[in-house]
From Swiss-Prot:
Any Pfam family matching the protein: ABC_tran
Protein's name in the database: ATP-dependent lipid A-core flippase
Record EC number: 7.5.2.6
Positions bound to ATP: G416, R417, S418, G419, S420, G421, K422, T423
Species this protein is from: Bordetella pertussis (strain Tohama I / ATCC BAA-589 / NCTC 13251)
Length: 623
């Protein structure tokens, strides 16, 4: 396996020749960076209050369903103390035969109360699930909207696992725990208040003993809150790391097999898996310790209640029915109190998940300060004026004072060694990368003055790494037109891309699904499908980013023929690795270390015997 994976923390790269453990060092560095970035601010009270406000402002948008659910929970809560109250007449009068109608009335009352509680609980749970799922849909919609608007640089960080976890796990935890908190807080609080009322009515002296122990239980719960918050935050981080490691194992399975990377990948996975287990056990330990400690406090109170009750019974101040009713109410109060004390853990998990979700929602979208649209008709003139760019932490400019003009309909090829700045330069045109200096003009209009929608609507891209969506061939081709297009246009585009014959041979023709990552298509077929998509868009400026570099000779020939049709009448910027594909360009610009060192037609550059000639001759010797 490789000694260093791009996009991981700096500590992962071996310094001074030191070899690191690929199953431990990078993951450890990544986890510690995640933890450091996420720890301190989240624990502050203002941040917690802001998270609460943001979560429940979204829940409050569905206040009608919420209010109805609360009323139903109140109805369910009212049945519990009533069941306890029934114990007194049942024992004092029912068994003595003093009131014969109790023989049928009390059993029916018990059944009716339990039935009422079941109905109220069902509909309140349904309404809360309705609220939760609507809020979840809204939050995920906000997250996806922000995801689509993030700058291109944000996607270069390689934190795919963390992003996926935010959508699949964190967003669900926010709404799930938020409604759980409402359910427990409302339902169990009402039950506790009602039962305490019954207890006070039965015997205020016995009730005071119970009330003395409640603050102790609350204090224990608060003591565990901060620890649970930290543990849950680390668990979220480790879940993201686990997702990333598994995702890399799936995507890189061929490399793992060919380079015998089984042991390295097992070590990477075992490290994350074991660390996740440790945090899960810490969380489970804290949760498990909270309940028995609370129960010990309650049991002390129960022991004191029994002692005082026996004393009152001996003096005739307390009947058997009253004591049984009191104990029934007391027995019912334990579970609600337990659920209320456990609420701290759910609150912390909700806040950790909310922090993760809103971190994405609050990220700054790509700058779109332009207000102009390209004047019609769009000609396709492109000019770079002294454009420079340096990536953060780089020791030199990736692109340095580059200037050139591409007239409408011209084809200009950018060539040079790897790292010479070709891709960075071209990525500035659609504003995926922003220049640090200089200007880029599209039809004599500075691109920063244009809206992103106007600018990008007049650009098409065909790259080496073709992105196709898990949909039909027709849908992928029609994507270039921004939506559904008629079958005739799709077929025309496929024909121009030399792909129609293949597509017609499929059982469903143009309506055949391409599968995830277009796994059912070959590399050449994917490229030609991307060309058909660009043909449908019919933009005046075309960017070709090493579109044929990964193809075999036959596929390259077919794709090259399709590209020639696509390039006709369009301004084209070509990034080429195979110099044989750019010989017919109107002009070739040779870059080295971010600067233009040569430019001109193919024949002139060969005759000049400079860098271009050196690269060209080197390739043909290799061929």
């Amino acid at each position: 396996m490789l000694a260093w994976r791009p996009g991981r923390p700096d500590g992962c790269q071996a310094a001074g020749g030191r070899r690191y453990n690929p199953g431990h060092d990078c993951i450890k560095a990544s986890v510690s960076l995640n933890s450091a970035a996420r720890n301190a601010p989240a624990g502050s009270q203002p941040v917690k209050a802001e998270l609460w406000k943001r979560v429940y402002s979204r829940v409050g948008s569905y206040w009608k369903g919420l209010v109805l659910a609360v009323l139903l929970m109140a109805g369910a809560a009212a049945t519990q103390p009533t069941l306890a109250v029934i114990m007194k007449p049942l024992l004092d009068d029912g068994f003595s035969g003093a009131k014969p109608h109790y023989v049928w009335f009390l059993p029916l009352a018990v059944v009716g109360l339990i039935l009422l509680r079941g109905i109220c609980n069902f509909f309140s749970d349904y309404l809360l699930a309705w609220v939760a799922n609507n809020v979840l849909r809204g939050i995920r919609g906000e997250m996806f909207e922000r995801l689509l608007g993030l700058p291109d640089a944000d996607f270069k960080r390689g934190d795919t696992g963390r992003l996926l976890n935010r959508f699949t796990i964190d967003a669900g935890n926010v709404t799930g725990y938020a409604t759980d908190v409402i359910t427990v807080l409302v339902r169990e609080t009402l039950v506790v208040i009602a039962l305490i009322g019954v207890l006070l009515y039965m015997s205020w002296a016995l009730t005071l003993i119970i009330l003395v122990m409640l603050p102790v239980s609350v204090g224990i719960a608060r003591a565990f809150t901060r620890r649970l918050r930290r543990i849950n935050r680390e668990t979220v981080n480790m879940n993201a790391e686990l997702t990333r490691v598994v995702s890399e194992g799936i995507d890189g399975q061929r490399v793992i097999k060919l380079f015998d990377g089984y042991d390295a990948e097992r070590r990477r996975f075992d490290f994350v898996n074991s660390r996740l287990r440790r945090f899960a056990m810490r969380s489970a330990t804290a949760d498990a310790a909270l309940t028995p400690l609370t129960q010990v406090c309650i049991s002390v109170a129960v022991g004191a209640v029994i002692a005082v009750a026996l004393s009152q019974a001996n003096s005739g101040a307390l009947t058997v029915g009253s004591f049984a009713s009191f104990m029934a109410a007391l027995a019912q109060i334990f579970d609600p109190i337990k659920r209320l004390t456990n609420l701290a853990g759910k609150m912390q998990k909700m806040l950790v998940a909310a922090e993760s979700v809103f971190t994405l929602v609050d990220q700054t979208p790509e700058a779109d300060a332009g207000t102009r649209a390209l004047p019609e008709p769009v000609r396709g003139k492109v000019e770079f004026r002294a454009v420079s760019h340096r990536f953060p932490d780089a020791d030199r400019d990736t692109v340095s004072a580059v200037s050139f003009l591409v007239e409408p309909g011209q084809t200009v090829a950018l060539v040079g060694r790897s790292g010479s700045g070709k891709t960075t330069l071209v990525n500035m045109l659609p504003r995926f990368v922003l220049p640090d200096g200089g200007d880029i003009l599209f039809d004599d209009v500075p691109i920063q003055d244009l809206t992103l929608r106007s600018l990008r609507s007049h650009l098409s891209l065909v790259s080496q790494d073709v992105v196709l969506f898990d949909d039909t061939i027709a849908a992928n081709v029609g994507y270039g037109a921004g939506g559904t297009v008629d079958d005739a246009r799709v077929r025309d585009a496929l024909a121009a891309a030399n792909l129609l014959e293949f597509v017609d041979g499929l059982p469903l023709g143009i309506h055949t699904p391409v599968g995830q990552n277009a796994a059912r298509l070959s590399g050449g077929q994917r490229q030609r499908l991307a060309i058909a998509r660009a043909l449908i868009k019919n933009a005046p400026v075309l960017i070709l980013d090493e579109a044929t570099s990964a193809l075999d000779n036959e596929s390259e020939r077919q794709v090259q023929a399709s590209l020639e049709r696509l390039m006709r009448g369009r301004t084209t910027l070509v990034i080429a690795h195979r110099l044989s594909t750019v010989q017919n360009a109107d002009r070739i610009i040779v870059l080295d270390a971010g600067k233009i060192v040569e430019h001109g037609p193919h024949s002139e550059l060969l005759a000049a015997n400079g860098l271009y000639a050196s690269l060209y001759n080197m390739q043909f010797r290799e061929d």
